[in-house]
């Protein structure tokens, strides 16, 4: 089994610093012959607070024609308790509804 691992893409419709990295990466992944892609977190810039960031990112991820698992990172669902964006049930529920299960 061939697995491609990607991480920390930090995509956003409103803060597009890294969005230009996507198309070359998606083209490479689709041509890689991989059986599975695992994105290991920080899919979005501010997915912890912005539905539109996660929705935008999932539109990009759908361009990959290989099965993909996405692990949420701190930019996706929040960070430590006491931080400005702590992980909580609301953020995790939103992630699951917009992205899918967390692994």
Regions found by a protein language model. Give the residues of each.
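N-terminal active-site segment of His-dependent metallophosphoesterases
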Residues: 1-56, 60, 100-102
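Extended active-site neighborhood of metal-dependent phosphoesterases/phosphodiesterases
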Residues: 52-103
């Amino acid at each position: 089994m061939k697995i491609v691992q990607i991480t920390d893409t930090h995509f956003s419709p409103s803060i597009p610093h890294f969005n230009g990295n996507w198309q070359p990466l998606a083209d490479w992944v689709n041509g890689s012959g991989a059986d599975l892609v695992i994105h290991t977190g920080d899919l979005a810039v501010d997915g912890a607070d912005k539905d539109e960031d996660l929705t935008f990112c999932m539109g990009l991820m759908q361009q990959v024609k290989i099965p993909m698992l996405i692990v949420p990172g701190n930019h996706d669902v929040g960070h430590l308790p006491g931080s400005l964006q702590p992980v909580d049930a609301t953020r995790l529920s939103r992630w699951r509804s917009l992205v899918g299960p967390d692994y």
